[in-house]
Amino acid sequence: MFSENISLRNAYRQYGTEVLRELFLDWEDVPSDDSFVRSLHQVQKALWESLPINVSEDHPMLLPSTQGTFRSLYAAQAVQAKADIRRVDKVAFGVVGDAHWSYPHLQLCERWNALAEKMGFSAVFVPITITFSQTHLNLEAVAVSLERTESERLRFTDVLRLEASKCDTLLLPPLSLSQSWVHELEKALDKPVCEPLCSRETTAGVRLERAIASTFQKMGIPVFNTEQCKLRWSGGNIDKLEFLDSARQLRTATADQYVLTTGRFSSRGFNIIGKRWGASASGLPLFIERGKIWQTAFPPVEGYQKLGLALTADFRPKFSSEETANNLRATGSCIGGVDIGKRKLGLGLLALLGRECAKKMAKP
């Protein structure tokens, strides 16, 4: 067992180093091995503060997936790890859904129950149908409204309280709820709350975006949430930024320096062909390493590709004409998991490089 744990730790370290080497490939000053280790801890800390991770070093967790299966993983978000059916005995999971959501909770219950019985596990999945939304919504819209509106969170808690007695643990849709609110919800309902794995992490970027925004706000830099943005040029500089806010209202921002983040952009699924790229990042240079798929070093082995904004070594967006703006920088790169069967990209890892970007901005 001891040797297995050592091998697993080495696999995680190798994985983290590979991720960082990919992210640093285009840099002029490639860090030394010692810098890699320090940078890995910084990246992990930033990621884990916004997306807490549970790691199992002895046996893999067996977690329900929205594909109607169970996946064997050594690491998962903390809220997902609570649904490990290997570590529960005769637990009834209440699978929450709403008829207006794009989430087939009834069908998932049937598949998970059939599979659990076949595999000899005692976990039971009980459908809990609530009435929360009045119109048809995808889960991303539900998650954003819950993250941003306190009244919606209170109403959601009240609705769940009416049904909580039907189960031992509530299994919500993959909403990527913040850890602090998960704790509040568990305290209010007196029940554990968890989420299933999702083949495409639809809303993790909401929380990562908030972590990036918090970093900049502490530095005294205003942060705007945009649905779409358009850059206005003047003499090699960005003169102003026009953008649609969350209410779809056109706004204008002017500043001496601009920093763009990619949390919202890279949290969504994208067609590998690239047909859906322009929707939420119009006018920005996007890239994907089409010909390169590398693999993680620990189970389950998955393919990954790098996508995001095309940047120079000093974090300037690099447009097709090799033109860059003097007063524009961008943060963030995404190592995206690839679903070869469905030809989709999911959020594998978004590295928060705001600190390094800020250092570049501070240089004369």
Role assignments for model-derived ranges:
Residues 250, 284-342:
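FAD-binding beta-loop-beta segment adjacent to the flavin cofactor pocket
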Residues 117-135, 199-200, 270, 277-306:
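Central beta-strand plus flanking loop segment that forms part of the substrate or channel wall
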Residues 2-108, 112-113, 117-137, 158-161, ...:
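Conserved N-terminal/central alpha/beta ligand/cofactor-binding core
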Residues 213, 230-253, 258:
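Conserved beta-strand-loop-beta-strand element in the redox core of flavoprotein oxidoreductases
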Residues 217-229:
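A conserved beta-strand/loop element that lines the FAD pocket in flavoprotein oxidoreductases
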